[in-house]
A protein has these predicted regions:
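Structural signature of hydrophobic alpha-helical transmembrane segments
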Residues: 78-91, 139-147, 208-218
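Central hydrophobic cores of alpha-helical transmembrane segments in multi-pass inner-membrane proteins
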Residues: 82-101, 150-154
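Membrane-interface helix-boundary motifs at transmembrane edges
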Residues: 102-113, 162-173, 229-241, 291-298
Length: 367
């Protein structure tokens, strides 16, 4: 039997416990909005490293701005800018893709049907379209797919930054995807399908629907901005690399298609893509080909940046220079050489699937 003293001494503790429980319940019931907002936290984990990301993944946009200024303000001939970009950056980035597919012995063995089947199909598609009078259709396929390929890569880097910085809320993922898509698709659509369809040889436009498209753009900006304000007020982490990527590429696309026709726009927006791709390929190859027997080319170009640059330039020149001259002389040759780009666009949509490829996750240090 407990003494009266022990009962009395424990009673206040019990009452205090009840009061604390009640206070906790009331505190948890207070709506979050009436609490003071937390200071935003800065999230800045990088894909490759701070310096490389800021220089080549995000800072690559500066190369696009340099092209814009060189052509529009300084009147450097677009033909000169085109050749410098085509051989120096675009053809070389296709070599980058080939270095981890066709030149990789393990990849050739594992994905033989994908690699050689797609190459056979796309190198035959161009000449087939030419033979049935579809050169304009082929040119449109190449142009639209090439631009989609560029913005899809920006999206891919955005996703990598989201994964790295745990920015994975479903609402934000949807809004990020929608915002980037609208803000990069609208500029060329506005130029070529509303105001200057003649630059693509089109006989129709969507000029009457222009107000609707501007409302769509404005609504996208308002909703996206509102979401970011809400996140800041809640004290959610701010994904710094993601927003730096947006700040680099989105204004570039708007300025490019405001001032340049397709001839100038192609190298201006694509050189950014090329530099990003080279940085990612170099990072991937250095990690993947350090050990194992993957073939002579991957081993050689992954050990020395100079080797990578020289081999890529030779590869690019060997098909870009004759491809241009033969394409001028023969439509069939033009169709055939389109196969390089089309095969690249297709394979690139297959070989960078981080979720389903453990080896890729390891090479990109995403595990």
């Amino acid at each position: 039997m407990r003494s009266p003293e022990s009962s009395v001494s424990r009673e206040p503790d019990a009452r205090r416990g009840c009061k604390l429980d009640a206070l906790a319940a009331v505190t948890q019931a207070v709506p979050q909005s009436v609490l003071p907002s937390s200071a935003p936290r800065w999230a800045h984990r990088w894909i490759i490293g701070r310096g490389v990301d800021l220089t080549f993944v995000i800072g690559s946009a500066l190369a696009g701005y340099a092209y814009l200024v060189a052509n529009v303000a300084l009147h450097v001939p677009i033909s000169l800018l085109w050749w410098f970009w085509s051989v120096g950056f675009d053809g070389t980035h296709i070599f980058g893709m080939a270095s981890r597919t066709f030149f990789d012995a393990e990849a050739r063995q594992r994905n033989r049907t994908l690699l050689f089947g797609s190459a056979a199909f796309f190198f035959a598609l161009g000449p087939a379209l030419i033979l049935i009078g579809g050169k304009a259709v082929l040119a449109m396929i190449v142009a639209v797919w090439a631009y989609y390929h560029v913005i899809r890569q920006h999206y891919g880097f955005m996703v990598l930054y989201k994964v790295k910085n745990r920015d994975l809320a479903k609402t934000d993922s949807f809004l990020d995807r929608w915002f980037l898509g609208v803000m990069t698709v609208f500029p060329p659509f506005h130029r070529f399908f509303i105001h200057h369809p003649e630059e693509l040889g089109l006989k129709f436009s969507f000029a009457r629907m222009e107000p609707f498209f501007w409302v769509l753009v404005a609504a996208t900006v308002v909703v996206y901005t509102g979401r970011q304000v809400l996140r800041i007020r809640r004290g959610d982490p701010i994904n710094v690399p993601k927003f730096l990527l947006f700040a680099g590429v989105i204004p570039l696309h708007w300025l490019t298609f405001a001032y340049m026709s397709w001839m100038g726009a192609v190298p201006t927006v694509t050189i950014v893509h090329n530099l990003q791709y080279h940085a990612l390929i170099w990072f991937h190859n250095r990690n993947r080909y350090r050990v194992g027997d993957h073939g002579l080319v991957p081993k050689a170009v992954s050990r020395s940046l100079l080797n990578y640059v020289l081999v890529a330039l030779v590869f690019s020149a060997l098909y870009r220079v004759p491809g241009f001259h033969l394409g001028q002389a023969s439509d069939l040759a033009f169709g055939f050489f389109c196969g390089f780009g089309l095969t690249h666009y297709y394979l690139d949509s297959k070989i960078w699937r981080v979720r389903s490829d453990p080896g890729l996750r390891q090479a990109l240090q995403m595990a």
